[in-house]
From Swiss-Prot:
Its EC number is 6.3.2.8. It comes from Salmonella newport (strain SL254). PANTHER family: UDP-N-ACETYLMURAMATE--L-ALANINE LIGASE, UDP-N-ACETYLMURAMATE--L-ALANINE LIGASE-RELATED. It catalyses: UDP-N-acetyl-alpha-D-muramate + L-alanine + ATP = UDP-N-acetyl-alpha-D-muramoyl-L-alanine + ADP + phosphate + H(+). Belongs to the MurCDEF family. The keyword Flavoprotein does not apply. One of its GO terms (molecular function) is ATP binding. One of its GO terms (cellular component) is cytoplasm. The gene is murC. ATP binds at residues 126-132. Keywords: ATP-binding, Cell cycle, Cell division, Cell shape, Cell wall biogenesis/degradation, Cytoplasm, Ligase, Nucleotide-binding, Peptidoglycan synthesis. The keyword Nucleotide-binding applies. This is UDP-N-acetylmuramate--L-alanine ligase.
């Protein structure tokens, strides 16, 4: 939206004239930065604060945003509104200062809802697969020439950004259930990929509460809107009768409205047929591995079909799909001769998955595409509460690899919980007798401890949602070769 469009929006909503300067606390997060980027392109004055520079803050600076790498009361001076992420505590000095100055303080999703208010909103929710599905829907709409605005929780690799301002009526956005703030959104179309027990502190440990919140989210759709839901998921199947909106189901299940059939994976690509009611079958080549990504594609196709997008555009977008950052992200294939003296190579893949279901899907995709590879995982558990609540599931899933290195738990601000640490998890896995995990307490020693387990025909999965992505990039930069004095800054 250019300045002329902004003026038009402000004429539709005269009160928007009051909003000139928008300040984001925690602006370096992908979700926050994406919204800030769209608003910057709409002509608003953007400022924000975070603890350290990153690619998100660098992109925003290039758009004219003012970024502070501290949290101080004076940072919010002259702001019309302050937007906060769920990771920011109420005693943050900028939030306190905003309240004292009677500046409105809103959550990220509330600002996203304002962006969606006068657009055709497509919101993608669910425990797993949101980011990739959002990117797939965005890619299809872009390929069809519909020029959508999108706001994603991860880097859309084809665009090189987390968010992009389009000039059409379409807004495609990831909807985050972690703090229940997705209830602010009022989309025209909503996808729900799956529902599992995660972020249960938000829902007071009550899974029924979580399920009802998803129902409430879907009931934010207008009566003429549409819910697109994965019927393979047992919780979604249970909830379907309670959804009082038009629905389209998708999945491998025989009763799905959009059904995946004849799936096979060859290397990084999935090949399958999509059967649609009253429509020609689609023979899909998807440039993303794993059955879980076939489901994500089925959701995107269901939405695109409902919109009337041409089948050829759908197929082109899926075959050329470049994926999202840190989702089965290929970082390179490196010769092992300089690493440990062995012939052959090792592939390096970075993946954000940090829930047992996500880790399992990544392992299955790796096994399906590269069945002869020695599968090595460097895993970083994320949050002590998640490690505690899903301890047995993690232990079961992680025994499926051939070699496992484990970093300490990434706390994400949490205090340690006895028995929910990496040493305990390694011990439990070792006692099951399938593999002997290696605990890596010092991230600077990853390359040194990784080298001996590589055989010359390896696929290395760097797995987790904490700072392990930095370690993956470091391993790529040094081509897996142990350094004489490995720098600690990458950890």
């Amino acid at each position: 939206m250019n300045t002329q469009q902004l003026a038009k929006l402000r004429s539709i909503v005269p009160e928007m004239r009051r909003v000139r300067h928008i300040h984001f606390v925690g602006i370096g997060g992908a979700g926050m930065g994406g919204i800030a980027e769209v608003l910057a392109n709409e002509g608003y004055q953007i400022s924000g604060s975070d603890l350290a520079p990153n690619p998100v803050t660098q992109q925003l600076t290039s758009l004219g945003a003012t970024i502070f790498f501290n949290h101080r009361p004076e940072n919010v001076r002259d702001a019309s509104v302050v937007v906060v992420s769920s990771a920011i505590s109420a005693d943050n000095p900028e939030i306190v200062a905003a309240h004292e100055a009677r500046i409105p303080v809103i959550r990220r999703a509330e600002m996203l809802a304002e962006l969606m208010r006068f657009r055709h909103g497509i919101a993608i929710a669910g425990t797993h697969g949101k980011t990739t599905t959002t990117a797939m829907v965005s890619s299809i709409y872009a390929e069809a020439g519909l020029d959508p605005t999108f706001v994603n929780g991860g880097l859309v690799k084809a665009a090189g950004v987390h968010a992009r301002l389009g000039h059409s009526r379409y807004l495609i956005a990831e909807a985050d259930e972690s703090d229940a703030s997705f209830l602010h959104l009022q989309p025209m179309v909503a996808i729900v990929t799956n529902i599992e027990a995660d972020h249960m502190d938000t829902y007071h440990g009550d899974f029924e509460n979580l399920k009802q919140t998803f129902i409430n989210f879907l009931h934010n759709l207008p009566f003429y809107g549409r819910a697109v839901m994965c019927v393979d998921d047992p919780v979604i199947r249970e909830l379907l009768p309670r959804v009082g909106r038009q629905t389209t189901t998708y999945g491998f299940s025989e009763d799905a409205d959009v059904r995946v059939e004849d799936y096979q994976q060859i290397g990084p690509q999935g090949h399958f047929t999509l059967l649609r009611q009253g429509m020609p079958d689609l023979h899909v080549t998807l440039n993303a591995p794993g059955r879980h990504n076939a489901l994500n594609a089925a959701a995107a196709v269901a939405v695109a079909t409902e919109e009337g997008i041409d089948d050829d555009a759908i197929l082109r977008a899926l075959e050329s799909f470049q994926g999202t950052g840190r989702r089965f992200d290929f970082l390179g294939e490196f010769p092992l001769e300089p690493v440990n003296g062995k012939a052959g190579t090792a592939m390096l893949v970075d993946d954000y998955g940090h829930h047992p279901t996500e880790v399992d899907a990544t392992i299955k995709a790796a096994r399906a595409g590269w069945p002869d590879k020695n599968l090595v995982m460097l895993f970083q558990p994320h949050r002590y509460t998640r490690t505690r609540d899903l301890y047995d599931d993690f232990a079961n899933v992680l025994t499926q690899v051939d070699a496992l290195l484990m970093l300490d738990v990434y706390p994400a601000g949490e205090a340690p919980i006895p028995g929910a640490d990496s040493r305990s998890l390694c011990r439990t896995i070792r006692n099951r007798g399938k593999i002997d995990p290696i605990l890596v307490s010092d991230p600077a020693q990853v390359a040194t401890m990784l080298a001996p387990v590589l055989t010359g025909n390896d696929l290395i999965l760097v797995q987790g949602a904490g700072n392990v992505g930095k370690i993956a990039r470091y391993l790529s930069e040094i081509k897996l070769k142990p350094q004489i004095q490995e720098e600690e800054q990458h950890g």
